[in-house]
Amino acid sequence: MRNAMNETWMAGKWFDPRAAVLICVLLMVAIAATQSACAAQAETAPLRVAIVGLEHGHVEGFLHALPAHKDVELVGIADADPALWKKYGVKFALPDTLFYKSMANMIERCHPQAILVYTPISEHRHAIEIAAQYGLPVMVEKPLTISVEDALAIRNVAREHHIEVLVNYETTWYASNREAYNEVKQGELGAIRRVVVHDGHQGPKEIGVPPEFLGWLTDPAQNGAGALYDFGCYGVDLMTWLMHGETPLTVTAVTNHDKPEIYPRVDDDATIVLTYPHAQAVIQASWNWPFSRKDMEVYGATGYAITVGADQVRVRREHDAAERLMTAPPLNKPEDDSLDYLAAVLSGKIEPKGDLSALDTNVIVMQILDAARESARTGRTVRLTRVGE
């Protein structure tokens, strides 16, 4: 007998339990190492993104920035216009194999992990609905869509298919806006009393946007409105963020057609006034500014913060003898860039709820813009109640 060796007779051979334990341990270590390696590979693998639509001029900014994002891989582009394939293919040395006429075909062949939409605003809902069928998250250019009806439909499909829908605004990545927000959050300005936002430029035709962009930008059926939507959305988004998603009590808007010979179908200047129980916002959106601008003034009960460009703020607090100009602290990664932010949301590092890009914020933005359009049309103030959750 080999009791001293703790051996057992099995299947006609001697079997050592200690060897079995060792083998099990080694297998567990190997499996853990494999899983760790796979997780690390997934963590470092580039995010596979696809573009839908080339009619939006902002797609050029994305393609310019793409080479700096080694953690992002463009795997496909869907657009029905071969002339735009050629335009961007030549300009950015993109291979012909990237381009598809059908969004669904592109998704099935390229297997992206996220969709970036650069279509006319009116097509956002359709693109999101297709992406949802494949369980793919979507980032669209501002604003979310052209009506509150579409916004609610997008929210429903996002919930049904458990996908993220984000909205990209240039001003989200301004350190100056974050610093103004932090001044309020930290109590340096007291309770918000008044916010004034200015956004716009000399006009899309005046600054030379490409014809495929200008065509839909000046069509109310495709853009929702003119300057009212194109630039009013920035201030509405910022105010909704500052107010932590509170719906205003009333929306009043007036629009002008100062250049009807250039923009006969849409407004080129708009002012939106939002009232809250203890605060007011005045949003001035225009295609008639003498220069491009995106700035915000936040006035509290005891101080103010006025943004200057993307990274400076003029601040005066309660006991300051005069205002001071400060450089806003740089935004921390991944909240300093749309693609980094998208990747962080998809990996679970960021919960977007309440953010400038978040769907819940932008459903409220669309409710306000829709009401502003109606107010401008009728000449009456529109009273709001929060849309159902």
Regions found by a protein language model. Name each.
Residues 1-17:
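N-terminal secretory signal peptides that target proteins for export/translocation
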Residues 20-34:
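Bacterial N-terminal signal peptides
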Residues 38-92:
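N-terminal Rossmann-like dinucleotide-binding module
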Residues 41-43, 114-116, 344-389:
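C-terminal helix-rich "cap/oligomerization" subdomain common to oxidoreductases
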Residues 45, 57, 172-262, 379:
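Predominantly a Rossmann-like dinucleotide-binding segment in NAD(P)-dependent oxidoreductases
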Residues 96-102:
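Conserved SAM-binding strand-loop segment of SAM-dependent methyltransferases
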Residues 109, 114, 120-121, 125-172, ...:
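Beta-strand-loop-alpha-helix segment that lines the small-molecule cofactor/substrate pocket
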Residues 235-312, 339-351, 371-372, 388-389:
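Contiguous beta-strand/loop segments that form the cofactor/metal-binding neighborhood of enzyme cores
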